[in-house]
């Protein structure tokens, strides 16, 4: 069921910037987004970038020690969001980076919000071409353990996520 909600051009721009990893200057790399949240506009007519809810690559190691945990802490406990997370992980064979599309719909979000976000998910997914990993999360218990994301990325072949070994 389509909701009629549109995707703001800035959302597509952010996705394309995160998706394309071109060689850049150290300053450009620092400004690159590691994670970002998207929400509905106040009038519920379009999906927009939630400006205050993002992690820049340049913040890692300075303001942000653990990008995954910081991303989880950005999620509101009482409302839905869409998110993009640029996961850096290691398998037994190689290092990899993949974008993960996350649909956050916590159990205690208002029913109306869950319905609008669920029915608008296809609109944003269609704009995010080439996403390999999609994850619907319904509560902190589903997302707080980095092993759960590692399972989504490749199961038991993932040995570390964001430089942290998996047990």
UniProtKB/Swiss-Prot annotation:
What are the record keywords, sorted?
Answer: Actin-binding, Cytoplasm, Cytoskeleton, Nucleus
Q: Which residues cross the membrane?
A: none
Gene Ontology molecular functions: actin filament binding
Q: What region holds the ADF-H domain?
A: 4-153
One record GO biological process = actin filament severing
Q: Name one GO cellular component term.
A: cytoplasm
Q: Do you know which InterPro entries this protein is assigned to?
A: ADF-H, ADF-H/Gelsolin-like_dom_sf, ADF/Cofilin
Report motif location: Nuclear localization signal: 30-34
Give compartment(s).
Answer: Nucleus matrix; Cytoplasm, Cytoskeleton
Q: Where primarily located?
A: nucleus
Top-rank lineage group of the source organism: Eukaryota
Query: Which family, according to UniProt?
Result: Belongs to the actin-binding proteins ADF family.
Annotated function: Controls reversibly actin polymerization and depolymerization in a pH-sensitive manner. It has the ability to bind G- and F-actin in a 1:1 ratio of cofilin to actin. It is the major component of intranuclear and cytoplasmic actin rods.
In its UniProt entry, what is this protein called? Cofilin-2
Q: Which organism is it from?
A: Xenopus laevis
Q: What lineage is this protein's organism placed in?
A: Eukaryota, Metazoa, Chordata, Craniata, Vertebrata
Q: Which gene encodes it?
A: cfl2
């Amino acid at each position: 069921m389509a909701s009629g909600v549109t995707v703001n051009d800035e959302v597509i721009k952010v996705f394309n910037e995160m998706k394309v990893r071109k060689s850049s200057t150290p300053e450009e790399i620092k400004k690159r987004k590691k994670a970002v949240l998207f929400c509905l506009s106040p009038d519920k007519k379009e999906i927009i970038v939630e400006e205050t809810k993002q992690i820049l690559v340049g913040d890692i190691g300075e303001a942000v020690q653990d990008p995954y945990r910081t991303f989880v802490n950005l999620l509101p406990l009482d409302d839905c969001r869409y998110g993009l997370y640029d996961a850096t992980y290691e398998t037994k064979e190689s290092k990899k980076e993949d974008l993960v599309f996350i649909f956050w719909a916590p159990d205690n979000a208002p029913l109306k919000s869950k319905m609008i976000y669920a029915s608008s998910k296809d609109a944003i997914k269609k704009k995010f071409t080439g996403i390999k990993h999609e994850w619907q999360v319904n509560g902190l218990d589903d997302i707080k353990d980095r092993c759960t994301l590692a399972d989504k990325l490749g199961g038991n072949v993932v040995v570390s996520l964001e430089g942290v070994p998996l047990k």
